[in-house]
């Protein structure tokens, strides 16, 4: 690696990191939060088997788990304008990633809810709680505890998936690296650099996952 490449990497580091702080991290946080809310609603509908709505959410989960995320991005950003729905790249990315996360996490939460011992609900009902209260105050907290590892896995996967937003012109880290590579003609080194930054983000989340798991295990 010659001095020119080292200088390019040093000069480009913050040019790649800043879009990460401005776009990649906010995109991850916003879409995971919205996706988690969608997942909770879908999981509850699936568990209670609410008529009509259950069939709709089953179809939604089937579609978003069965099609590539990149195709979903293109349909929402490039396809919807054909029926008069015009979205900015940022909004299209948020909608797509949120729906995708919601579909995957709903199955995680549904399994976690079903894994909670039925006696927990019976005990909650016996002290005067309604079905809804038992779900939100007793069952869901235990379900989240059971699902902490797969939910973190989904979050880590989402961090990496945000790089796909570059395909619809969202200037996140990968797009920033592409632009610098086009000017410097050093794509290999720059893509390795952006890979290292993604690795740092994901490693931090892995340690956070481990910390949360240890805290929950100590609480029993």
Model-derived features with residue positions:
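Transmembrane alpha-helices and adjacent helix-loop boundaries
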Residues: 1-220
